């Protein structure tokens, strides 16, 4: 779903600020867009104006857009993005024939923020990290772990075995996640890169808890749970870390 476009002067225009009948251009493929922001049943968005000459280009662009739509459509995802200025949302990056659209880009920090509510493949997770890192940007992910209920569990300190006891550090909490769930999302990532940071949010009795994954242990050779050693962050500290000051931009 396309929420931003360029006017003929090169200005980025959010869909809610677009005018019917005005010419807009797609940031990704450069072809014409029309604003669809008059209805109330669907989320407002831009759509490509059919162009026979550029049909293949538009088809590929729509395919990329459709891949993003499931995540964008969630109220959870939109509520996070809307905390940032419009010029920092849905920022398009191109390198060679590769095109990615960041949920949020903080140029002063050289950081990309990705909000992940729906499931993501490990291939997509690694592709985005590799792409943004190749441009010199760090990536901070926030995953909605409420969507993984039943696939991971908190380990109380009284239940630490010898293995966990060897790795846990003061101030850390430990979660176990079944290996299939972990690998399908993160692949072989184990929190070793200084340019890829993964946080997750979970809700309990309407309270939000934020955790930063510090260390991941477990062997992919054996069918055993992965252990996530995390630092829990106060909400204010977490919001500051992703560029939201005092809870608001």
Question: Which residues fall in each region the model found?
Answer:
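N-terminal cysteine/histidine-rich coordination modules
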Residues: 1-79
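Non-catalytic C-terminal interaction segments of nucleic acid-processing enzymes
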Residues: 3-14, 18, 151, 156-249
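Active-site metal-binding core of divalent-cation-utilizing nuclease and nuclease-like domains
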Residues: 15-18, 77-112, 117-124, 153-155, ...
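Surface-exposed charge patches
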Residues: 24, 82, 130
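Short aromatic-centered micro-motifs
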Residues: 26, 104, 168
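Short, surface-exposed basic-aromatic patches at helix termini and helix-loop junctions that form
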Residues: 106-108, 129-136, 159-160
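Basic, amphipathic alpha-helical patches used to engage nucleic acids or provide basic targeting signals
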Residues: 116, 120-148
């Amino acid at each position: 779903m396309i929420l931003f476009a360029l006017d003929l002067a090169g200005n980025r225009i959010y869909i809610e600020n677009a005018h019917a009948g005005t010419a807009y251009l797609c940031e990704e493929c450069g072809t014409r867009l029309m604003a669809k922001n008059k209805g109330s049943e669907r989320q407002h968005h831009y759509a490509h104006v059919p162009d026979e000459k550029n049909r293949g280009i538009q088809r590929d662009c729509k395919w990329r857009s459709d891949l993003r739509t499931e995540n964008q459509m969630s109220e959870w995802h939109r509520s996070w993005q809307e905390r940032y200025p419009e010029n920092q949302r849905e920022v398009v990056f191109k390198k060679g024939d590769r095109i990615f659209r960041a949920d949020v880009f903080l140029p002063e920090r050289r950081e990309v923020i990705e909000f992940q509510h729906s499931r993501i493949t490990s291939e997509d997770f690694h592709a985005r990290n590799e792409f943004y890192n190749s441009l010199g940007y760090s990536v901070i992910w926030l995953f909605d772990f409420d969507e993984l209920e039943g696939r991971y569990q908190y380990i109380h300190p009284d239940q630490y075995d010898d293995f966990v006891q060897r790795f846990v550090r003061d101030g850390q909490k430990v979660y176990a996640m079944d290996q299939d769930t972990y690998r399908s999302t993160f692949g072989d990532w184990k929190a070793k890169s200084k340019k890829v940071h993964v946080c997750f949010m979970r809700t309990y009795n309407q309270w939000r808890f934020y955790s930063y994954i510090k260390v991941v242990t477990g062997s992919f050779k054996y069918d055993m749970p992965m252990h996530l050693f995390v630092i829990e962050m106060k909400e204010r500290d977490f919001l500051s870390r992703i560029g939201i000051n005092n809870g608001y931009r």
